[in-house]
């Protein structure tokens, strides 16, 4: 994956840590953003769906028509190339579905939910279920008590296998499992998520993740996935399991992998603090994320990779205004804005090695600020 893409903000020192309250307010940041950045156009938003869908169809057509007739050595190279390209484009569509959940697609909530439901269901994601848990994450980012996901553990609570596998081969194994199965395991078992009094997942309408008024839509999300699975069953009957796996299954798994890598890197970095209830507030939490540079993939992924800090502050800004809004608020954020342009594979390895558990900030009277550390 890419690194070293273009942008106006220079790389900040890796170990720079800012945990004091910012000298500005959300209102100050909002006033710095040009008003048109908050405008959502259903026509412009729909253009990106059509654009991505056409490219996805072209990739599908080429893979279905030509890869099977290639000689074996070339086919073994062509399939992984198709999987990467198709997964990249489908992740872009997933990002648009995610924007629908933030009401950033159009001025009409029903349009946003309809589009998001279709896109996410096709990509095997329970739209409403994830929308609601993701809303909780945005409301409580980096709160050790209330955040919904990516909640780090203290040194004493780190699983034994992390200690046993604290070497390069073991780290590779953990990374492989984390980045391939992390999102499905989170949806099914709430792994790395907020601890509830009973078992929680994204498919049970009675899960403690959801409020009473949300339960019907959680069921609707399940029905959407069942409809897609029925379509997969028909495709398997018509074309065979191997064809469906290669054309659809592996690219969707690739979407999950992209999601895991992107969100992990957005929320895992030595410069990102976590807070307990004595120190946390919404603005502090929203600023405790970091932008990443995925090179040429930034545009393919609709800039979700390097506008994440802005997104946590103003999640209803559509992606086609995100870079302009980011640059506008950076004049106010100053050192409170974080971006790391380390090449992505290198960053993944470094974070997996350095960010194992959290410890209280040293030299403070309050113990409410925590930082990543390693064994």
From Swiss-Prot:
Pathway(s) of this molecule: Lipid metabolism; polyunsaturated fatty acid biosynthesis
What are the protein's UniProt keywords? Answer: Fatty acid biosynthesis, Fatty acid metabolism, Iron, Lipid biosynthesis, Lipid metabolism, Membrane, Oxidoreductase, Transmembrane, Transmembrane helix
Protein's membrane topology: Multi-pass membrane protein
The reaction(s) annotated as catalysed by this protein in its Swiss-Prot or TrEMBL entry are: a (9Z,12Z)-octadecadienoyl-containing glycerolipid + 2 Fe(II)-[cytochrome b5] + O2 + 2 H(+) = a (9Z)-octadec-9-en-12-ynoyl-containing glycerolipid + 2 Fe(III)-[cytochrome b5] + 2 H2O
Which Gene Ontology terms describe the biological processes this protein takes part in?
unsaturated fatty acid biosynthetic process
Q: What is its main location?
A: membrane
Is-annotated flag, keyword Iron? yes
One GO CC term on file:
membrane
Motif Histidine box-3: list the residue ranges.
308-312
What's the cofactor?
Fe cation
Q: Which InterPro entries did the record assign?
A: FA_desaturase_dom (IPR005804), Fatty_acid_desaturase (IPR012171)
Q: Where is this motif: Histidine box-1?
A: 98-102
**Which EC number(s) does the record attach to this protein?**
1.14.19.39
**Where do the TM regions start and end?**
54-74, 77-97, 110-130, 172-192, 218-238, 242-262
Tissue-level expression: Seed.
State the source organism's domain of life.
Answer: Eukaryota
Gene Ontology MF: a single term: acyl-lipid Delta(12)-acetylenase
Family to which this protein belongs: Belongs to the fatty acid desaturase type 1 family.
Q: What is known of its domains?
A: The histidine box domains may contain the active site and/or be involved in metal ion binding.
> By what name is this protein known?
Delta(12) fatty acid dehydrogenase
Q: Which organism is it from?
A: Crepis alpina
């Amino acid at each position: 994956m890419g690194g070293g893409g273009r942008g106006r903000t220079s790389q900040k020192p890796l170990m720079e840590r800012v945990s004091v309250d910012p000298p500005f307010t959300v209102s100050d940041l909002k006033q710095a953003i040009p008003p048109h950045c908050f405008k959502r156009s259903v026509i412009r938003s729909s253009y990106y769906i059509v654009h991505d869908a056409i490219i996805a169809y072209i990739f599908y057509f080429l893979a279905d028509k030509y890869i099977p007739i290639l000689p074996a050595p070339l086919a073994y190279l062509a399939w992984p190339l198709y999987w990467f390209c198709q997964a990249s484009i489908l992740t872009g569509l997933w990002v648009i579905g995610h924007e629908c959940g933030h009401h950033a697609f159009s001025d009409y909530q029903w349009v946003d939910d309809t589009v998001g439901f279709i896109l996410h269901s096709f990509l095997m994601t329970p739209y409403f279920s994830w929308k609601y848990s993701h809303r909780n994450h945005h409301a409580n980012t980096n709160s050790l008590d209330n955040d919904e996901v990516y909640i780090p553990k203290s040194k004493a609570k780190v699983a034994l296998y992390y200690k046993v596998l604290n070497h390069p081969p073991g780290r590779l194994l953990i990374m492989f499992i984390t980045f391939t199965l992390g999102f499905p395991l989170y949806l099914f078992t709430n792994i790395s998520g907020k601890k509830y009094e009973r078992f929680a997942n994204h498919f049970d309408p009675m899960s403690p993740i959801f409020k009473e008024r949300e339960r019907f839509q959680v069921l609707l999300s399940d029905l959407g996935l069942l409809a897609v699975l029925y379509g997969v069953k028909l495709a398997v009957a018509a074309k065979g399991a191997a064809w469906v796996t290669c054309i659809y299954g592996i690219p969707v798994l690739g979407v999950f992998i992209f999601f895991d890598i992107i969100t992990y890197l957005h929320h895992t970095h030595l410069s990102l603090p976590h807070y307990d209830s004595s120190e946390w507030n919404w603005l502090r939490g929203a600023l405790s994320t970091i932008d990443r540079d995925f090179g040429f993939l930034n545009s393919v992924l609709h800039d979700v990779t390097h506008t994440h800090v802005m997104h946590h502050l103003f999640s209803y800004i559509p992606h086609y205004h995100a870079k302009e809004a980011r640059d506008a608020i950076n004049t106010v954020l100053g050192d409170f804005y974080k971006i790391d342009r380390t090449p992505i594979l290198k960053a993944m390895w470094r974070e997996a090695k350095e960010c194992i558990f959290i410890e209280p900030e040293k030299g403070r009277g309050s113990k409410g600020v925590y930082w990543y550390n390693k064994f």
